[in-house]
């Protein structure tokens, strides 16, 4: 019988097939993490009808879990977390949500699909599931939590549900095989590090309603080929598009006031850029190692923006900065702009 945080088993297990856990909210995750072998017979953990039902269907002689079945509508927080040998889970179609850390760090879990009725994926739901091979997500999902698919290198999504409005921080970090060519039109924000190291990400546009892009959001996405940014973006944080050699931007949103450090570093696809009139600050090395950058047109700027260190380091040999003729001398004398005085031309 259950006692406190323990399940007490009889000394004889002959004919025994299951163990009943009376308080799944407090005991389920703790016990699932342990090997359940009763006298060498495959064991099971069963919760009351109102809670989740989890059954180990194949337990090796060592007691390590290889497969599991689940019954219930919500996968609780940490329900399957840290099951290093779990390879598959059979979830019914009526599952509607997977809680935070539901399958966190299940490195051998291989799922190709999720129940179609799921509307919510919690933070870290599938983080560090390196064998996960999902090709699509349930259509009812409207947001993706923080770290939800972090470090899932085999994730093979080609699209996201149309109702998604936000993507959390680190949501797809290191999803190196994920091929997305577009994002849902209703997205308004993309979190920090959301697509870091997504080597196959092949977006050419971003949804027009996006107003916020986090730091390192698209860092090291070598196939990203954007030609414009959404008009509602007013600032770009640190390293948002660093190491994106196929970026082909020429202009920036008119209301943009700041470009963060390293924002476009190594943007070798940039050839000519026009800075927006509202711009007040450019961070350190924002355009460093943009080897093909020949022109930075500042003629729309109404004042000299503050400039960080080495912003245009290693630009093209013929690089020049165009500024309003009335502000030419002020530009040449300004901190850090003075390093490029010979390349500043009033027009």
Regions found by a protein language model. Give the residues of each.
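A structural signal for leucine-rich repeat
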Residues: 309-314, 335
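Acidic glycine-/aspartate-rich tracts in secreted/extracellular proteins
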Residues: 325-330, 336-337
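Consensus positions within tandem repeat domains that build extended binding/scaffold surfaces
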Residues: 77-79, 99-105, 122-128, 145-150, ...
């Amino acid at each position: 019988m259950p006692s406190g945080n323990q399940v007490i088993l009889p000394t004889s297990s002959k004919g025994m097939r299951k163990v009943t856990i009376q308080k799944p909210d407090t005991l389920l995750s703790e016990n699932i993490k342990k090997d359940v072998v009763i006298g060498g017979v495959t064991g099971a953990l069963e919760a009351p009808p109102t809670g989740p039902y989890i059954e180990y269907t194949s337990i090796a002689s060592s007691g390590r879990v290889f497969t599991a079945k689940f019954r219930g509508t919500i996968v609780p927080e940490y329900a399957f977390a840290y099951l290093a040998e779990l390879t598959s889970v059979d979830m019914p179609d009526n599952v509607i949500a997977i809680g935070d850390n539901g399958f966190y760090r299940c490195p051998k879990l291989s799922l190709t699909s999720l129940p179609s009725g799921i509307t919510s994926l919690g933070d870290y739901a599938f983080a560090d599931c390196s064998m996960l091979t999902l090709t699509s997500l349930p259509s009812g999902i409207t947001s993706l939590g923080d770290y939800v698919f972090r470090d899932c290198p085999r994730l093979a999504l080609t699209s996201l549900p149309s109702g998604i409005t936000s993507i959390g921080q680190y949501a797809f970090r290191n999803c190196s095989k994920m091929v997305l060519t577009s994002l849902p039109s209703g997205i308004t924000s993309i979190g920090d590090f959301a697509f870091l190291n997504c080597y196959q990400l092949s977006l050419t546009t971003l949804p027009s309603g996006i107003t916020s892009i986090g730091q390192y959001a698209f860092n090291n996405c070598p196939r990203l080929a954007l030609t414009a940014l959404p008009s509602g973006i007013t600032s770009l944080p640190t390293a948002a598009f660093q190491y994106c050699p196929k970026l082909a931007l020429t202009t920036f949103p008119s209301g943009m006031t700041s470009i963060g450090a390293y924002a476009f570093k190594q943007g070798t696809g940039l050839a000519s850029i026009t800075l927006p009139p509202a711009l007040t600050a450019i961070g350190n090395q924002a355009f460093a190692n943009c080897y093909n950058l020949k022109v930075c047109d500042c003629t729309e700027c109404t004042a000299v923006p503050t400039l960080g260190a080495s912003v245009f380091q290693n630009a093209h040999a013929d690089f020049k900065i165009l500024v309003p003729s009335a502000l030419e001398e002020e530009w040449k004398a300004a901190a850090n702009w003075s390093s490029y005085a010979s390349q500043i031309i009033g027009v």
